[in-house]
Every structure is written in C-alpha cells, then in structure tokens.
Amino acid sequence: MKAKEIRDLTTSEIEEQIKSSKEELFNLRFQLATGQLEETARIRTVRKTIARLKTVAREREIEQGKANQ
C-alpha cells in the first residue's frame, strides 16, 4: 500500500489496517519458522506497510496537536 493511498483512509481505517498487517506479519513469521513460507520478501513488504501506516497516523496526531494549541 502506497503512502498516498494510506493518506486517503480515515484514522480508524488506518488503525484497522495496522492491526490486520500485524496479524499477517505474525502468520508470515510463523510460516517462516516452520519452513512453509515460499515468498520470503512478503515479510519485508508487510513491515514496510506497517511503517507507512504508523507514519501517517503519527502525522495526523501531530496535526491535531498543533490545531489544539
């Protein structure tokens, strides 16, 4: 998911995406440990997506803080 797509989501949708991505990452790591994971690059892409989601969420937090001052 690209940053532009993430910025179009609402804050609650971003939180849901973070939650589902973390679950997916957990499952991918479990598959890696058991030797069932074929597409190992998927772990990296999910981690990057989580980072992008968290970055946009933090940007919104900072914007709200500035608006309240």
UniProtKB/Swiss-Prot annotation:
Keyword line: Ribonucleoprotein, Ribosomal protein
Record carries keyword Ribonucleoprotein: yes
GO cellular component: cytosolic large ribosomal subunit
GO term, biological process aspect, one: translation
A Pfam family per the record: Ribosomal_L29
Coiled coil: none
InterPro entries from the UniProt entry: Ribosomal_protein_uL29, Ribosomal_uL29, Ribosomal_uL29_sf
SUPFAM superfamilies in the record: Ribosomal protein L29 (L29p)
Molecular function via GO: structural constituent of ribosome
Superkingdom per UniProt: Bacteria
Family the entry assigns: Belongs to the universal ribosomal protein uL29 family.
NCBIfam families: L29
PANTHER family: 60S RIBOSOMAL PROTEIN L35/50S RIBOSOMAL PROTEIN L29 (PTHR10916), LARGE RIBOSOMAL SUBUNIT PROTEIN UL29C (PTHR10916:SF0)
Protein name as catalogued: Large ribosomal subunit protein uL29
Gene symbol of the encoding locus: rpmC
